[in-house]
Amino acid sequence: MPHAPSAGGDDTVAQLRIFPRVCPQYGCDMTDIRDSARSATQALRSLFEPTPLQRNEHLSARYGADIWLKREDLTPVRSYKIRGAVNAMRKVLAQTPDQEVFVCASAGNHAQGVAFACRHFGKRGVIFMPVTTPRQKIDKTRIFGGDAVEIRLTGDYFDQSLAAAQAYCAAEGAHFLSPFDDDDVIEGQASVAVEIIEQLGQAPDMVVLPVGGGGLAAGVRSYFRAVDAPSDFRYVEPLGGASLTAALKVGAPQTLPRVDSFVDGAAVARIGTRSFARLSDIPRSSVLLAPEDRICVTMLEMLNVEGIVLEPAGALAVDVLPVLADQIRGKSVVCVTSGGNFDFERLPEVKERALRFSGLKKYFILRLPQRPGALRDFLGILGPDDDIARFEYLKKSARNFGSVLIGIETNSTDSFAALFRRMEDAGFDYRDITEDETLANFLV
């Protein structure tokens, strides 16, 4: 459900003490990300092997292309965030070996990456999370961090946790680790690009990247440019959190007034300043928006057909392949599946949204005559494949008609047209409310 943030979603950070040094337009020197990304990649090898780059036969056959999935959902913490967290901490400790405490504010993948890094380097981590953080995310962060990490539940909203984290850093001399708006984090994420080229043996024709705060996209694109790789890029944002699109329109990061938090790994209200410095010259046409309900269809397909569990943000790159079908035919395409930290308690919501988007489930209000046999009359016009998924009715003794909320599932979009015709022929008055977002958010 949309909300009004001040800086971003779960894994965002207010633009605190950010002085970009990566782009001339910000009055700074360009970083040689080619060497730094390779150094980051080498450092990561002591922690885990390169994530698989897998040719997907199903998607390749569907689009007449060579579709490769860069499986960042298979890192030790099931997301690419471990790369930036480890590299940033490594760089800090190289310059300040006696730095003992690292802090972040996050209820998502960044927290788990920081927890893993703290345990690896033997440093203390303090992770601030909102009190409302699901128990599953708290427990997973504790597992990755072990005794090295302390979790502090503070505030009902992310911004309150962030403020507490910043206050703690100021008071205790701790080092704050940003989820994306940090050059060392961006260099760490660029290790994804190093691995892609090494594993494929050449640069692919196209790379499709998810975008939230922009750290991954900035790192991968910067490395490809540094090694003169001729690949095209497509950047995918959730429709309800298009922070890169907003920044490109005016040439600078903007804070979105509202963000849909469903794609929690990319629900960012403001793209990182350092990230945008590396992305500010991309064509606006290269940025694609993915509707949240369509992402659910992609998640279910990847789960049911491929056996791959992706979180909403992790499915972004695959989700836009139908939109790119004409552009990728006969080409090699790498889609970065950025994360697989999916809480299966959300599966009913994902299925619900996917069915609605696909036109296989509808909700409507039916005015039902309050007479004996009226319900039986309605049930008689249902088709053999029409399944009642929801039925709510409260009889009004002083009225001739009562309102019924009905949810119907079917296996063909054509079934609803036929059902509505039969309802009209039978004299039933109804209103389709499937596309009413206010009601939909209440029902799901």
Which residue ranges define each predicted feature?
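Intrinsically disordered, low-complexity serine/threonine-rich segments
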Residues: 5, 9, 18-21
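PLP-dependent amino-acid enzyme catalytic core
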Residues: 15-444
